[in-house]
Design a protein with these regions (language model features):
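Noncatalytic, basic helical substrate-engagement surface that gates or grips nucleic-acid strands
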Residues: 3-4, 25-152
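Residues that line or immediately flank small-molecule/substrate-binding pockets and catalytic motifs
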Residues: 32, 177, 588
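Non-catalytic, largely sequence-independent nucleic-acid-binding elements associated
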Residues: 72-82, 96, 102-104, 113-114, ...
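Extended two-metal-dependent nuclease catalytic cores across DNA- and RNA-processing enzymes
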Residues: 92-306
Length: 728
């Protein structure tokens, strides 16, 4: 969003308001990030405690369906556009997240000082710190399930929307003010679903109100004011221009008019200013200007095009990032794969922002700087070796918010080509269905994928290297199953001969403990955390919110069980969260979230490898492939609500005179449902789900080899299991 734009437009009395009726028989292009951000940050739809829980908003799906239905009821067809491979603006997002950590600390200080109402208010101001990109895939899945069209742009959603505005593909555009910098005549700036009306503005009236003389001068004004991919010109930020105090967009226009120069000349004029040098502002302005002028979009025929390509500089890749294969953009455009790994490859950079808890813990910093490296290099190698040799020889710089000046290098060239390791997975539908029927397992379940390989004959026969005489995989069940087998082999659960490894056998033990498909993904995620030595009862975080009642043993066991519960979600009504909070468990969930996201990248790149290497029938529709992708594990982020519920229950039991008695257990469960978590759909049922997940994870721990879980740690788990069995 252009800094100061809304304030300026309101003061200048710009814009118009019309009823949704005017959108009848129209296709409305909607900038997805702006649409989601409005839900997250404005009343009555925002959930103030989302930054204190992590994960996904409880009411988001219902709100999206309601708002989409409202548009459709008025005869309007919504068409959502998501940003894709975005390299510009990452530094701005990083700095914004770093600044937000101070407000995060303030909110938690208020909560710790027993001022919950003030804390909730402060948390409510932090809704903008939620990384909307982490919610993209969830929202896309909602849209897909409800038959709402969407497209992921090659790069900027704003540029993509401008390129289709007023065409047969899109009659009108709604989104952030950034879109006005691109070639567009009119923009809907607000959709008011309560009043069923919208506000809109024209680019021409903005230009006239600012008194600038050309569209290029208007674009410079917007850039220098500050936007999503360029910070505000320091002289405007520090109010050193001599202009009357007011919206930055007005000040930027006045500065350009007073000097009768363009944006580049103005930046050259201030280039030696220490603030300009510190921000490398001239270089960043020039890149941002070219980013707008030579934007990249996808045409209806799937062709990727650059605007004004004839005058584009030869080093445009320094602005947009390395050019990626059009096949990758095609899969991205329909949600078959996400943008994370593509962004890494295009920009040669991974940027780690601070998590919602603030990121003060050494354990989290070690995880993102070192612990996630194997997952990242696995995803990068799957893409690089399947796409083009060029990408294999470009090191990726990992920059973390706590030490941005000392990036670490990830070298894909140091890895081996993973394709030869996993190319033997081309199992046919008849084999898959026959085995699923025999096991009485759903083909879509992880328990089937792992359990099928307990049969040594099936495992042996599953070695099916693709050859010229074999037809490629052509059914969703085939593609999904083989993508998952490849993923699990890459993660070490399956050996080269397709037999289960020691890790795979432990995982199978976990799945056999309870026949609950909804707990399979949490169990696998817990096992991955165990492998990283992050599923334990160690005090890893310098925060409040850990168990406080009972003996040291009670506290240790409560903490371990609560951390396991964080892998499964609390089923909550479609309303903002009400209940106790824990910064300690939020910090733990931040680590779980980081691992989950990187596991998802490996899963998606396993699917990409199948597609890019012609193991899948090329005639399969992109929508069909997308449906497969959205069914794969680790799609949605996790929150700490169920972990808090388990901690609250067990902590309260430890304060009872007879913590293991049925009377105490029932009384605390009723109290939890009625007083602590009044909007939980089934507090007691979710506690039992958490305990069932504990049973599964504990079964895997007990069966784990000593090099994964030491005898000392197994004893801690065993003691906790006995302790918990009396408190369920």
């Amino acid at each position: 969003m252009i800094s100061g734009f809304n304030e300026w437009a309101a003061s200048a009395q710009l814009g118009h308001t019309d009823s949704f009726v005017e959108l009848n028989d129209r296709r409305l292009g909607i900038e997805a990030e702006d649409f989601i951000a409005n839900i997250l940050t404005t009343a009555p739809t925002k959930e103030p405690l989302l930054p204190a829980l992590g994960g996904l908003p409880f009411a988001l799906e219902e709100i999206i369906i309601q708002q989409v239905t409202t548009l459709k009821d008025h005869g309007c067809e919504p068409y959502f556009i998501f940003s894709g491979v975005v390299s510009n603006g990452q530094e701005e997002r990083l700095q914004s997240a770093i600044r937000a950590t101070k407000s995060i600390a303030k909110a938690w200080d208020l909560y710790g000082a027993s001022q919950p109402e003030y804390a909730v208010t402060e948390f409510g101001t932090l809704s903008g710190t939620i990384n909307v990109e982490n919610i993209y895939r969830f929202v896309q899945d909602i849209l897909r399930k409800n038959g709402v069209a969407f497209l992921v742009a090659p790069h900027s959603a704003c540029a993509q929307l401008a390129s289709i505005a007023g065409t047969e593909f899109c009659d009108a555009v709604a989104g952030s003010s950034d879109i006005l910098m691109f070639e567009i005549d009119q923009l809907i700036t607000e959709l008011d679903f309560e009043k069923a009306q919208f506000s809109w503005i024209t680019r021409r009236e903005c230009i006239e109100a600012l008194g600038v003389t050309s569209t290029s001068m208007f674009v410079d004004t917007c850039l220098l004011a500050g936007c999503s991919f360029l910070p505000t010109l320091p002289q405007l930020e520090n109010d050193l221009t001599g202009s009357p105090k007011g919206p930055r967009i007005r000040a930027a226009a006045d500065l350009l008019k007073r000097g009768q120069i363009n944006g580049n000349a103005l930046c050259l004029q201030y280039r030696d200013d220490p603030a300009m040098v510190a921000l490398d502002y001239l270089n960043r302005y020039q890149k941002a200007s070219l980013y707008v002028k030579h934007y990249v979009c996808i045409r209806p025929n799937g062709k990727i095009e650059t605007a004004d390509v004839a005058s584009a500089p030869s080093d445009l890749n320094n602005i947009m990032g390395h050019r990626l294969p059009e096949e990758a953009f095609a899969y991205l455009s329909r949600g078959v794969i996400g943008s994370d790994v593509l962004c890494w490859i295009a920009s040669n950079e991974i940027i780690e922002r601070p998590p919602l808890d603030g990121g003060d813990a050494d354990a989290y910093r070690r995880l993102v700087s070192d612990g996630l490296t194997p997952l990242r290099t696995s995803a990068l190698s799957l893409l690089s070796y399947s796409a083009h040799r060029f990408y294999q020889h470009n090191p990726i710089a990992l920059r973390c918010w706590f030490n941005p000046a000392a990036p670490k290098k990830l070298n894909v060239s140091d890895t081996t080509d993973p394709r030869s390791t996993i190319s033997g997975w081309n199992v046919r539908l008849d084999q898959i269905e026959a085995k699923a029927n025999k096991l009485e397992r759903d083909v879509s379940s992880l328990a089937f994928i792992v359990g099928s390989l307990q049969d040594t004959d099936f495992a042996k026969n599953s070695v099916t290297a693709k050859s010229g005489g074999n037809k490629p995989l052509s059914s969703p069940k085939e593609v999904r199953s083989n993508a998952l087998w490849r993923f699990l082999q890459l993660r070490g659960y399956i050996q080269q001969d397709h037999q289960l490894s020691a890790l795979g056998k432990c995982l199978q033990t976990a799945f056999m403990r309870h026949n609950q498909q909804d707990l399979e993904e949490p169990a696998l995620l817990a096992f991955e955390m165990l492998r990283l030595n992050l599923l334990n009862s160690n005090n890893m975080f310098p925060y409040n919110g850990s168990p406080q009642r009972g003996s040291d043993t009670d506290k240790r066991n409560t903490l371990l069980v609560s951390r396991v519960a964080c892998f499964a979600g609390l089923r909550h009504k479609t309303i903002g969260f009400t209940g106790p909070l824990s910064r300690h468990l939020l910090a733990y969930t931040s680590m779980v979230s980081a691992v989950r996201g990187n596991l998802r990248n490996v899963v998606e790149m396993s699917l990409f490898g199948l597609l890019a290497n012609y193991h899948v029938d090329r005639s399969m529709a992109l929508d069909q492939l997308a449906e497969i992708s959205y069914s794969l594990p680790f799609l949605n982020d996790v929150d700490c609500a169920l972990g808090i519920a388990a901690k609250s229950y067990l902590d309260e039991l430890s304060a009872q005179g007879e913590p293991t008695s049925e009377t105490s257990r029932e009384a605390v469960k009723i109290k939890g449902a009625n007083e602590w978590f009044p909007h939980a759909k089934d507090f007691q049922g979710d506690l039992q789900r958490a305990f069932a997940l504990w049973d599964s994870v504990y079964a895997a721990v007990a069966a784990a080899p000593d090099n994964l879980v030491s005898n000392r740690d197994k004893k801690i788990w065993e003691e906790a299991d006995v302790w918990l069995s009396e408190r369920k």
